[in-house]
Amino acid sequence: MLRVAIAGASGYTGFELVRLLDRHPHAELKMITSRVHRGQRLDKVYPALRKHCDLVFEEPDPERLAAEADLVFTALPHRAAMDMIPDLLKGGAKVVDLSADYRFLDAAVYEAWYEPHKTPELLKEAVYGLPELHREEIRNARLVGNPGCYPTSVILAAAPLVAGKLADPRTLIADSKSGVSGAGRGVSLTVHFCEVNDGFKAYKVGEHRHTPEIEQELSRLAGEKLAVTFTPHLVPMSRGILSTVYATVIQGVTPEDISAAYESFYRNARFVRLCRAEMPTTLQVRGSNYCDIGWRLDSRTGRAVLIAVIDNLTRGASGQAICNMNIMCGFPEDCGLQDAPWQP
């Protein structure tokens, strides 16, 4: 049985990790940490977990975490993760990091969007944890940077078109809508009920921190440096992301060419479902690790319209983290993740 721990288990992604690990046949949760809730039982903070987990939150001590667990999920804020992860690795634990600290190939890119990086040498070995693109590298990794929620949806939507050279990658535009849980469990005016309910707004236009992740991975697929226009929006629902990606196709590309590219690219993808007849909705992936993708070619404008939906807490965070754990530890990729989505 694989021993696992969660550093920073009190947020929504921490809850989702516990919920999913509870049904995992080969992993046992041994330790959870939280400075704020230290000494409290998890099921007091999250009553939904009564009779599922009675662990008590402990102080985040990397030496103890590495001793108690073979693999640690770090569900910590940016910068806090990099304070802990080097010690976890030294202690022999594998790490799946849900912060942005180890998602980038280049420390300068991280520092341009976040803060100075304390351990840039670890970026050389960290693997970007999107299984559809980097499955073999993940298999041999001891440190995986779990992708952000928006990048997961945008990259998966655009990857076959970019990799197949069917569109001009310099024309990529991504428009994404997210549920409020993407902002985390903390209290702020931005996610106050009266500020969100009955409203729909764009935010961080032209400056969202997920932009460089999208650009990094699509640039790798394109073989050239790309700049992507990315605009996120907040919608009044609890969970879910719908991303619409636009790209101008190469002259002569047909709808059949696009369909063939998606079928080929995702032929072995356990958690990508292609919607051939209809456009996907966030409801059909709720609570699951699926990314559902639909597409159309607008022949009038020569643009491909690509639509991807995910659950931001599952495929966009904790479900993908467990999928990465499975790959790193030699388990079937869908272990603990086989449940159908919730509906309604």
From Swiss-Prot:
Principal subcellular localization: cytoplasm
Enzyme Commission code(s) on record: 1.2.1.38
Matching SMART domains: Semialdhyde_dh
Biological pathway: Amino-acid biosynthesis; L-arginine biosynthesis; N(2)-acetyl-L-ornithine from L-glutamate: step 3/4
GO CC, any one term: cytoplasm
Keywords: Amino-acid biosynthesis, Arginine biosynthesis, Cytoplasm, NADP, Oxidoreductase
Gene Ontology BP annotations: L-arginine biosynthetic process
Gene Ontology molecular function terms on file: N-acetyl-gamma-glutamyl-phosphate reductase activity; NAD binding; NADP+ binding
Entry annotated with the keyword Ligase: no
The family this protein is said to belong to: Belongs to the NAGSA dehydrogenase family. Type 1 subfamily.
Record function comment: Catalyzes the NADPH-dependent reduction of N-acetyl-5-glutamyl phosphate to yield N-acetyl-L-glutamate 5-semialdehyde.
Name this protein carries in UniProt: N-acetyl-gamma-glutamyl-phosphate reductase
UniProt organism field: Syntrophobacter fumaroxidans (strain DSM 10017 / MPOB)
Lineage per the UniProt record: Bacteria, Pseudomonadati, Thermodesulfobacteriota, Syntrophobacteria, Syntrophobacterales
